[in-house]
Amino acid sequence: MSKSQINLQDAFLNQVRKDKIPVTVFLVNGFQIKGMVRGFDNFTVIIEVDQKQQLVYKHAISTVAPLRPISMLNLEAKSDDD
């Protein structure tokens, strides 16, 4: 991936992490995890639920839904700065 392309997944996860926006993570098996994104890498996301952390593999995630809207303009501007 070239530097000029926006990595939307990383920008989205980083935005909800930095702004401490609660998310609902829907897994492919139907389970839902409601908590805060604490970190992520290429393969996993760390979600904090009730002061406990869960490591979730990205291939098990179908959807990440923030509890409040995030600005897509902020995501694009931050990605363009890289």
Swiss-Prot record:
<feature type="domain" description="Sm">
    <location>
        <begin position="10"/>
        <end position="70"/>
    </location>
</feature>
<comment type="similarity">
    <text>Belongs to the Hfq family.</text>
</comment>
<comment type="function">
    <text>RNA chaperone that binds small regulatory RNA (sRNAs) and mRNAs to facilitate mRNA translational regulation in response to envelope stress, environmental stress and changes in metabolite concentrations. Also binds with high specificity to tRNAs.</text>
</comment>
<dbReference type="InterPro" id="IPR005001">
    <property type="entry name" value="Hfq"/>
</dbReference>
<dbReference type="Pfam" id="PF17209">
    <property type="entry name" value="Hfq"/>
</dbReference>
<comment type="subunit">
    <text>Homohexamer.</text>
</comment>
<protein>
    <recommendedName>
        <fullName>RNA-binding protein Hfq</fullName>
    </recommendedName>
</protein>
<dbReference type="GO" id="GO:0043487">
    <property type="term" value="P:regulation of RNA stability"/>
</dbReference>
<dbReference type="GO" id="GO:0005829">
    <property type="term" value="C:cytosol"/>
</dbReference>
<keyword id="KW-0694">RNA-binding</keyword>
<dbReference type="GO" id="GO:0003723">
    <property type="term" value="F:RNA binding"/>
</dbReference>
<dbReference type="GO" id="GO:0045974">
    <property type="term" value="P:regulation of translation, ncRNA-mediated"/>
</dbReference>
<dbReference type="GO" id="GO:0006355">
    <property type="term" value="P:regulation of DNA-templated transcription"/>
</dbReference>
<dbReference type="InterPro" id="IPR047575">
    <property type="entry name" value="Sm"/>
</dbReference>
<dbReference type="InterPro" id="IPR010920">
    <property type="entry name" value="LSM_dom_sf"/>
</dbReference>
<keyword id="KW-0346">Stress response</keyword>
